[in-house]
């Protein structure tokens, strides 16, 4: 096996572990979900924006109003994802929430087919049907592990929101670098969260240092050690391999939740969650 691929697989594992920790950190937070999301994006922008301004160079001069508008829309979708998913973790089990939010791939597939004329094979439709069936069962399961229909519904809505973010990003990344795209999108996401804080009357200031540290952990582990590492791994590994590896996130998160919070999924959650992950994995296989 080439050294590059071996290294990439090790880094990919770190990325999966980083994203798995995010659900645990959100569960530890005692602040409102919007505050946790705002702190995460605040730290992310603070850490990434200076480097983006320096590395973007002349590309910033080529950014159009349309680019800014689409990146702003992408940021709004990402903000909704964080707000919805973080809130779901307060109402349902970590296992259910992370499994349901992984259906992002399915929402992306459907959106790509409906909006961009993308084609889905018969096997792909079968995979989508399996994931939808599993999601439906899982949404009403989990009573033994603190799951609620509302919390599971929020996780699914969060998956749909991040799928919209992904679809816009797929279009924008054709002519914008990762540096410029993420800088614009994350900034728009932070602004959106601050607006939501204001509209809902959520106090951003006055929370103890613990909450700021949780936000910093989310920015470092999930954004810098998670999504950014996934992007780096695509230089050595196939998108299908990376997507399949990301499905380990709900498994790792569920194990950590079992150890730290005593959350043990009941049989219905195990079966339906397995159906969801199997459907997503099967669809990923059809896209290889």
PLM features per residue range, with description:
Residues 1-17, 44-73, 86, 116-126, ...:
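Membrane-interface interhelical linkers
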Residues 1-3, 41, 52, 140-141, ...:
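C-terminal-most transmembrane helix of multi-pass membrane proteins
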Residues 1-39, 44, 76, 80, ...:
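Glycine-/small-residue-enriched transmembrane alpha-helix faces in small-molecule transporters
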Residues 29, 36, 40, 88, ...:
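Hydrophobic/aromatic residues within transmembrane alpha-helices
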Residues 31-80, 107, 111, 130, ...:
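Transmembrane alpha-helices of multi-pass small-molecule transport proteins
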Residues 35-46, 86-119, 158, 239-258:
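Specific alpha-helical transmembrane segments that line the substrate/conduction pathway
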Residues 48, 72, 111, 120-141, ...:
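Hydrophobic transmembrane alpha-helices of multi-pass small-molecule transport proteins
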Residues 97-103, 168-190, 223-259:
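Helix-helix packing/entry segments at the starts of transmembrane helices
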